[in-house]
Amino acid sequence: MHTSRRIDDREILLKRQSRIFFQVSGAGHEAIQVAAGMALRPGFDWVYPYYRDRALVLSLGVSPEDMFLQAVGAAADRASGGRQMPSHWSSPELHIVTGSSPTGSQFVQSVGCAHASSYLHPASDEVTLVSSGEGATSEGEFWESLNAACLDKIPLVFLVQDNGWAISVPSERQTPGGSISALLEGFPQLLRIEVDGTDFVASYAAMREAVDYCRARRGPALVHAHCTRPYSHSLSDDERLYKTDMDRAREAARDPLLRYPAWLVSEGLADERALQRIMDEVDRETQEITERVLRAEPPERGSALKYLYSETVDPTSSEFDTQPVFLGDPRTMVDEINLTLAEEMKRDSRVIVFGEDVADCSREQNLLEVKGKGGVFKATAGLQMKFGSKRCFNTPIAEACIVGRATGMAVRGLKPIPEIQFFDYIWPAMMQIRDELANIRWRSNNGFSAPVVIRVAIGGYLNGGAIYHSQCGEVVFTHIPGLRVVMPSNALDACGLLRTAIRCEDPVLFLEHKRLYREPYNRSPHAGPDYLIPFGKAKVVKPGNALTIVTYGALVQKSLQAAMYLEQRDPNRTVEIIDLRCLSPYDWEAIRTSVEKTSRVLVAHEDCLSWGYGAELAARVADELFGSLDAPVARVGALDTWVGYHPQLENEILPQVDDLIKQAERLLAY
């Protein structure tokens, strides 16, 4: 406890001297944190800490030197290589999963981590602990994680460290009644323990009871520990702006660094001189470590892109470029997705499919009497029947938890394939995708990775979908570093790209256009169980000499129809059509080669025209291929509005064949 506090104090001094760049302390939380660390088995149990958990991770084995290396942002920082702020703990060896700044986002990931324990080691008694302040319990992910953990009796210990303040907002303005543990009364399977988190002895008893409950696989447990916060939230905050002198005096009186030494002396377990010698030794060691760490080298220039993706498995390489071995009759795109999932589940027991309505039937006793659901589009039909309910199961309607759970499972080495039912409903999971899943490898300096494949149905051209079943917006996700984004236009590509997504080691957003699921024109015989298509390799679906159309998804077929019309009018001027297939990364060489041949380019996509995916391609063509162009770069996209319900509205809003023809004729007239 004293070591944790002295590191806080030393960092505060360094920040005031401008020798480090940020500081947040765990002062006042030391007793409950050390108790939690003593109840766990380092390197066996798993921990999702938050930024105040300095004493917890120290008790698990993180060294003071590691902490100071992170504070100065050194290349030798074992948690992140200088990429994360201080107090963002990470240690693969100690099973301390890399943390992030968004409060509460760790909850749903811890559900997946604890779920993985039950799946990978059913006979083991390992547990997962997730920690937060009381303010984070206002986040939706907290409630989603509790719901999931209680439903499945997941061995997960929630540690809520309640110091009474979420920066400047007191508990009574965060939680109805001011007590999170009181609100949770009635959650089935959940053990609730409320404890004075500044009392080490009581804290140890509480943590031991909670951990033992989870080890016995009786369900999740929650410890609500009342702490104190004798320092400001961080050095960016001044608590005197919202705390009275009396508030601050009361908190100081409950400081565990005063209470615990006094208790040791009163119980005859130590004398004041012995305690002082220990504290003096800690102070001396802290000073020595600080002086040494301040000389540490910063991250190397040129290392910023390192570990953005896996550096051992490259899905853009020739290893992922195989030839099809066609089998059977032509199949629809949705059938190919279903078969590819089944083949990969058979090949690799780590592959697990879950989401809303993906299972055949949640009530297993009914499986012999019903046909089964298997997804609203039948993409997962039969997978539960073939592989069991542990490998294909339904979840609550909670998109953040679906993605976060998958992230936690992937950290443990599983290959989760969650489904988001409609692209229009992916937004509750946005923080989990952008701030967590996509940057886990980068922010942990390759310490952790999360190769999740998120399947999502996307797009319009199905009458009646309207605002919430017909939108696109893929450009939002192609703007996220570390995330692969794929969108096949036909059954054959869906098979090869989905298999690559599952076998690669990066997170992938796999976009499945709803209109293309059962079209007759994009069917293909099955390409075999080892057919792979590398990411970033486009397909020239039609060669031409006078105009290049760069497109993907549902616009591929519409581009073919437009080209047919144009070439009927002038057979000597033909249109080349490039299906990108993969949006991040994309095949720039294919675009460059085609544009240098045709000297004209039209970029077409279904999403809104303004700030759409085509804007980046058009800008790069204009920037790098200007000398090859005989006409401006043109774009076709949807109107800058929402997709309407009535078919006439939808047809007006979404790009049609006539829109492609009009722009193509304008370019060909130059």
Task: Describe each PLM feature range.
Residues 139-162, 434, 438, 443, ...:
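A short alpha/beta connector and helix-capping loop motif
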Residues 280, 284-324:
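Terminal amphipathic helices with adjacent charged low-complexity linkers/tails
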Residues 2-129, 151, 160-291, 295, 305-511, 516, ...:
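Thiamine diphosphate
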Residues 133-138, 330-332:
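Short, glycine-rich nucleotide/cofactor-binding loops
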Residues 135-140, 198-207, 488-495, 610-611:
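Active-site glycine- and acidic-residue-rich loops that bind
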